[in-house]
């Protein structure tokens, strides 16, 4: 058990038997009355975000999640299929469970799948992924002096801003937490 004073962004807690991830929280001390903690919680199974208020010091059960390395096999409609790299068992997660993380996964990528009480509930992406640029405007000579950027569509369909010297076919490193370009790994 933890108290509402121990909350951190990304922490997983159990509320009414359901698992939630803390998106953001704020300690509030009103002029009159007791202090409280206002939170935004993401339901780990459905991906829905809701607001909940806890009394300061209120005890909450921390959700313990099991992590397993899995290989992403394929997507069929809104269903994403993964295979356990040790037991070769296959698991399916919905697009809602994966939230916006689908824009950075490609076939055969190794991903951490999160389980709670033996049931798969979400995934954890690597911090950095290397993806090919499938579409971007060509850079014009002299554009780099301003240090600007242009949008680029990646092989997974994600769109990120990249420097002008990046071309179609280049492989770039992207931070999955912020959706930002980090560096060019390999150019054409």
Swiss-Prot record:
Pfam families: EFP, EFP_N, Elong-fact-P_C. Pathway: Protein biosynthesis; polypeptide chain elongation. SMART domains: EFP (SM01185), Elong-fact-P_C (SM00841). GO terms for molecular function: translation elongation factor activity. Its main location: cytoplasm. One of its GO terms (biological process) is peptide biosynthetic process. It is found in: Cytoplasm. Keywords: Cytoplasm, Elongation factor, Protein biosynthesis. InterPro entries: Elong-fact-P_C, NA-bd_OB-fold, Rib_uL2_dom2, Transl_elong_fac_P/YeiP, Transl_elong_KOW-like, Transl_elong_P/YeiP_cen, Transl_elong_P/YeiP_CS, Transl_elongation_fac_P. Belongs to the elongation factor P family. This is Elongation factor P.
């Amino acid at each position: 058990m933890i108290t509402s004073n121990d909350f951190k962004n990304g922490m997983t807690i159990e509320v009414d038997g359901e698992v939630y991830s803390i998106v953001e929280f704020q300690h509030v001390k009103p002029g009159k009355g007791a202090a409280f903690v206002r939170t935004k919680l993401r339901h780990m199974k459905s991906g829905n975000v809701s607001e909940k208020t806890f009394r300061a010091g209120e005890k909450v059960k921390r959700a313990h999640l099991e992590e397993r390395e899995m290989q992403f096999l394929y997507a069929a409609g809104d269903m994403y299929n993964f295979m356990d790299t040790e037991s070769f068992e296959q698991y399916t997660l919905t697009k809602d469970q994966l939230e916006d993380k689908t824009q950075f996964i490609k076939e055969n990528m190794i991903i951490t799948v999160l389980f709670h009480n033996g049931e798969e509930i979400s995934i954890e992406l690597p911090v950095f992924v290397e993806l090919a640029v499938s579409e971007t405007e060509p850079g014009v000579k002299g554009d780099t002096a301003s240090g600007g950027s242009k949008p680029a569509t990646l092989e997974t369909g994600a769109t990120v801003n990249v420097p002008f010297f990046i071309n179609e076919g280049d492989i770039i490193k992207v931070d999955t937490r912020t959706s930002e370009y980090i560096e060019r790994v390999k150019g054409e």
